[in-house]
Structure formats: structure tokens, C-alpha cells
A protein has these predicted regions:
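Active-site-proximal beta-alpha core segment in soluble small-molecule metabolic enzymes
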Residues: 1-166
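Catalytic palm active-site di-aspartate
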Residues: 169
Length: 169
């Protein structure tokens, strides 16, 4: 995410996507010229109106909270939509050498280990016009080494295989 208009404009000109975590950042990305379909919308502080607008217009929206799953029911049933979901991950278990000492689960997303992720995915799948398109896994690490990203990818593959998911991203 970046809230510097000149930087966003340059990134848009280069064909990059904007990653936003709030209404303000979403509006700024649109103001500098990003197409809605070139926005990735993450974070637990989404407002309902912007959340629905982003989904309706093809943005990559990653669901972070249970209330966002409920909001999917307000989408027009005559159209199909795609969303992603944020996985709550414990970096200390996945990549201990890259985690801060004593680090536990993230406070964002849905935990695979306790069944919360599968339950959330099942609720999304009850919305017949909404397809789960991807997983979002993010966690700040001490090292930002290739190893941490490799371990997160392995974890994502484990989830995909375990839950039998067919995803686009």
C-alpha cells in the first residue's frame, strides 16, 4: 500500500496494481487513474459500500472478517463474482527461524489449524454466485528471506491440497 499520489500515478503508468486497505486508499487509487479491476483490496477495516463496489467491479478483494462474508449476500444474484480469503498464519510454526520470538497467530484472517478457514470457505460457497478465487497469506518476518516466502508457499499448497481447492491466485 502507498498513499503518495505521485508514486501511485507512476506505478499505474508502469502497469502495476494498487494494493489498498481502506476506503481512503481505494478512493486515492481511483483518483490517480487505477482501474477498479487493477486494485487489490485487503485488510479488516473495509467498509461495506467500498467492499461491494470493489467486488462488483472486478477488484481482487480478500475477505478478512466474518462480517465481510455476510456482506456477500448483498451482491446481485444475477451476476457472478470472485473473492479471495485471508489465511491467519502462525509464522513461528511455519518458518520459526524467520519469526519474532514468541510470535503467535496473526489477528487477521481465518485459521486453517482450528477449522475456521474451512468454515469460512464453506459459508462463501453457500453464495452460489460467488467463487473463491484465491488465498491471501501475509505476515511480516524478521528476515524477509526467500526461506520465509518458500515456507508460506508450502503452507498455502498444504491448505489447497487439504481442502481440495481450485484457485486462480
Amino acid at each position: 500500500t502507498n498513499s503518495l499520489p505521485y508514486m501511485l500515478h507512476m506505478l499505474n503508468e508502469l502497469g502495476c496494481y494498487a494494493e489498498v486497505v481502506s476506503y481512503t486508499e481505494y478512493a486515492l487509487a481511483l483518483q490517480v487513474g487505477f482501474e477498479k479491476s487493477h486494485i487489490v483490496y485487503n485488510g479488516p477495516a473495509k467498509d461495506k459500500e467500498t467492499f461491494l463496489d470493489a467486488i462488483k467491479n472486478g477488484a481482487y478483494v480478500n475477505i478478512d472478517t466474518k462480517r465481510e462474508i455476510e456482506w456477500l449476500n448483498d451482491l446481485n444474484k444475477q451476476h457472478s463474482y470472485k473473492v479471495g480469503i485471508r489465511v491467519n498464519l502462525n509464522l513461528g510454526k511455519i518458518s520459526p527461524e524467520d519469526a519474532k520470538e514468541g510470535e503467535s497467530d496473526s489477528r487477521f484472517g481465518f485459521s486453517f489449524e482450528n477449522g475456521e478457514l474451512e468454515e469460512a470457505i464453506n459459508k462463501i460457497q453457500l453464495c452460489k454466485n460467488v467463487k473463491l478465487g484465491g488465498l491471501h497469506l501475509h505476515r511480516t518476518s524478521l528476515t524477509r528471506s526467500l526461506n520465509v516466502y518458500r515456507n508460506i508457499c508450502k503452507y498455502a499448497i498444504r491448505i489447497i491440497n487439504s481442502l481440495g481447492l481450485e484457485l486462480d491466485y
